[in-house]
Amino acid sequence: MALERLRSTLRYAGYGLLAAGAAVAASRGLRARAGKLEPPLSGDHDSYRWRGMDIHYTEAGDPDDQTLVCVHGINAAGSSGEFREIVADLAADHHVVAPDLPGFGCSDRPPLRYSAALYEDFVGDFLAEYDEPAVLASSLSASYVTSALERGDTDASRLALICPTATGGPEPPKTWLRELLRAPVL
């Protein structure tokens, strides 16, 4: 009886491994066929190298005008395309720079922990590339911008926050379990 149970368990474990392997192969195949995303905004496109990642950004307007950095919100479809309807109007009077945050839009998406600290560091470093830019930030990114400014990573000449939210809240329980479950399959 015990031998039969062991065989059954091993058989189901084999099926599970086979299914997991098929899922990984399908995911890689779909990723390879997806191709690159088109830049969401009109303008000049470039990338900013940050911590080994290529961070896509778009520039519009006269570079001699006041720089306005537009930081999009964090959501399932987040990208600098959030500013699509207003970038031309903003570029009439400003040098607009709109990055796609790490893991969003046309920017790299390496398998790492995307946290508030990561985005605060990125925003601080990116804004420091410009001489006291004006900053427009929406949603949760407004919190990242204000944290970077508060830490003194950079200065801003003006700040506009659209629907700002806070990063606060309780830490999730059992973070070690969450990290284990989110680890890539090898």
Question: Regions from the language model: what does each represent?
Answer:
Residues 136-137, 141-145:
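Gly/Ala-rich beta-loop-alpha elbow adjacent to hydrolase catalytic centers
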Residues 30-66:
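N-terminal signal-anchor transmembrane helix
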Residues 53, 58-106:
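Conserved HGGG/HGGXW glycine-rich cap/lid loop of the alpha/beta-hydrolase fold
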Residues 3-31:
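Hydrophobic alpha-helical topogenic segments used for membrane insertion/localization
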Residues 146-185:
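Flexible "cap/lid" loop of the alpha/beta hydrolase fold
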Residues 80-82, 107-112, 170-172:
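Conserved catalytic-core motifs of eukaryotic protein kinase domains, centered on the activation segment
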Residues 67, 95, 132-134, 155-158:
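Structural signature of beta-strand start/N-cap positions in the alpha/beta core
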Residues 88, 98-136:
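Active-site loop/oxyanion-hole signature of alpha/beta-hydrolase fold enzymes
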